[in-house]
Every structure is written in C-alpha cells, then in structure tokens.
Amino acid sequence: MTFGEEGKEGARVNDLKEVDTARTYTGGTSEEYLGKINWKKRGLVMDTKLYPNVAHVRFQSTGSARISHSPEDLRKYLDISLKALQTDSIDMWYLHGPDRSTPYEVTMKAVNELYKEGNHGMYTIVGICRANGYIQPTAYQGIYNAIHRKVEPELFPCLRKFGIAFYEFNPLGGGFFTGRYRSLQDEVEPGSRFDPNKGQGRNYRARYWNEPYFRALSAMEAVAEKHNLTMAEIALRWISHHSLMKREYGDAVLIGASSTKHIEQNLIDLEKGPLPEEVLKVLDEAWLSVSPYATPYFH
C-alpha cells in the first residue's frame, strides 16, 4: 500500500474485495495502515505473507530481525501481523519464500496447527500435507507476464494437478512494461522499482534491465503505437485473455500502482477484450527473444 486516505472506497466501486500485503512491505507499516481502515467492515478479504530472510542474505538489512519458518517464528510473526491488521484471523497467509534452514515437514506441521486454531484460512508442499493429513496449500503467488513466462511449462501443470490457484504479480514488470524506460542509460527516480541503489531496484534490474529486454520493448512499443494501445493496456489484456490463468481455477491478478488514477486505469484495461492477432504475434516473438535471459520464477 503506497497511497490511500481513510474513507476513500474507490476499489469497492469496481467490486474489488481482496487486499494483498506482507509483513515486509514498507517495514511492516503496510499491515499497520490497513489495520486502521476498518477493512472487515468494508467487506474486504485480507491476505498477508511471512518472508524467511534468514535463508536469504540479500534481504537482511542492518538491525533487522532474522525470520525463519520455524514453528516459533511462524507463531510469533503471524501474531504480529494479526495485531498490525487489528484482527484475530486473516483469509490467506502465504509462506512468502522458501526457508531452506527449516525442514518443510516441521513448517507444514506448524502451519496446520495454526490453521486449526483459526488464525488463517488458506495458505500457500502437497505431498507432506496429504501424508500427514494437514491442510493443503490452496494458492501460489508468482511472477508472470507477457515477457516473463517461466511459470508456464513447469509450474502451471503442477498447480492444476493439485488444485492450487495461481495469484499473479508483476503484470507490468514493475513499470518496465509501461514504456517509461527505453534504454540501459535511462535515469530512474530515486526509490523507484529500478533504483540501483536499493535492494529491490537491483533485483528488478537483474530481471529486466538488459539489452535483449529493451530490444523486445522497442518492438512492442511499435505495435502498440500502430494499434493505438498503451503498453500497460497490452500487458493487462494479455494476462487477462491470453495467459494460462483461468478464473474457474481461482486464479487472480494482483495490481498495484503509485496513485488511485493508475489503479483505476489498470482496472479498466483488465476488463477490455482480447488483443489483436498482430499484437499477440509480436508479444510471442518478444518472449522468445528474451526467454534465454529471463530469470527463474523461483528463488
């Protein structure tokens, strides 16, 4: 949550009900902000996550707590999230990343115990859960867009087999897919998604900031101009109509922006129809050209 004012319910105009946050977002203040807006009374569904930075040095800042998916930390930080959100339960709780310092059997047992206590609904390891009679994962949140399709050949078949919904983030590539940037030499706004002086910026630059991606972007901009479409519109209409995501499986698109104006336009674009064949052809060719350089969907 990077913006907002109490009493504004623009999202509800579009019948949006689900809010996605995480303990790590804006140093925990995202959860705290959401806790102040009476989200339950507004009829909203709340999802949050716990990232295990103990296993990922690059996500450990000076003085920050070391968080794992051990039973102790799961209980401790779920309680912190619940207090920040001013609730006694949430609808979905994600294990935000892999914790290779804690055996999955130990983590899943703890998650199941918390579920039975009524602290969370769905969460997102199927074999371990089935073997032990634990609650099974119900959702996977991952990166997916027209120029990053690494999830298609391996992950989607797995999710479909086990009845797990896919929650997609990064439909606009963190802003890369908006036409805002055009070359490796472009200046970026301090604190933005591609700021090389920030950890998040370095991650996004590793993902998209290279010559093959900029060449693909140039081809997409040309076809966008020809059909009088915006780059963001192309990205959102692709994910809505031409990706492997299906509403009947419970799949969902996560969108975010720096202003309510951007959110409103994104929602409008998501509701538009399929893209022209020529645009799809250019997108497919763009993905083929960058796929050897695309980062893994997992870490």
Which residues does each predicted region cover?
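Active-site beta-loop-alpha junctions enriched in small/polar residues
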Residues: 22-24, 49-53, 95-98, 122, ...
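Glycine/proline-rich, positively charged
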Residues: 4, 57-150, 154
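Conserved, mostly hydrophobic/aromatic
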Residues: 19, 34, 46, 81, ...
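Conserved short secondary-structure transition element at the edge of the structured enzyme core
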Residues: 206-271
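Generic structural signal for well-ordered alpha-helices
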Residues: 31, 35, 78-82, 108-112, ...
